[in-house]
């Protein structure tokens, strides 16, 4: 593994961070536009997701708020300003700010499509204004049932058919995440939402 010292280059730092699954940190530091900010943030969110999914025995009974606070804590540890329950047209579950860039996230325990539907409507029609520096957001689906990919596929069909928006595959979490794009009611600009499963199912047979 590459060791860092005062003579290390950006390439050395990149190799070091990648070896530890933290390559998003360098991208966050170097982000000069909103697209780069969001790409790095999703790297941090994916890592936080994997950490939570690796401890389902201890997380499966957690409340929605507690799981969301754990997400915010993980993002804070990655160097972001990530706050829970900030007032922005309502009580937003996750608000991430970096300089002039911001990202809003809505989190729901996905027991039924009803919860996801209300969360998506809150995010897109109440919280986010769709400005160029706030052009993306996220839906976190805490899934405590078996077959998370099936539930995400069901939700994706609802997004497409009921809300009449375009959806795109997510290469980083195939089957467990997807994107939707629609016109923001406030700005009229494209607002991109990343819908993400967090698998918290725990039902051992022995």
Tell where the protein language model's regions lie, with residue ranges.
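Interdomain/boundary linker segments immediately adjacent to catalytic/signaling cores
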Residues: 1-65
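Hydrophobic, Leu/Ile/Phe/Ala-enriched alpha-helical segments that form helix-helix packing faces
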Residues: 45-52, 71-79, 127-130, 155, ...
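A short acidic/basic microdomain associated with nuclease active sites
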Residues: 57, 61, 68-93
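Short, mixed charged/polar active-site loops
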Residues: 91, 102, 190-192
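Active-site beta-strand-loop-beta-strand hairpin of nuclease catalytic cores
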Residues: 95-104
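Short, flexible loop/turn elements at secondary-structure junctions
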Residues: 98, 108-111, 199
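Catalytic cores of nucleic-acid endonucleases
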Residues: 109-163
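Domain-level recognition of nuclease-like catalytic cores that cleave nucleotide substrates
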Residues: 142-206
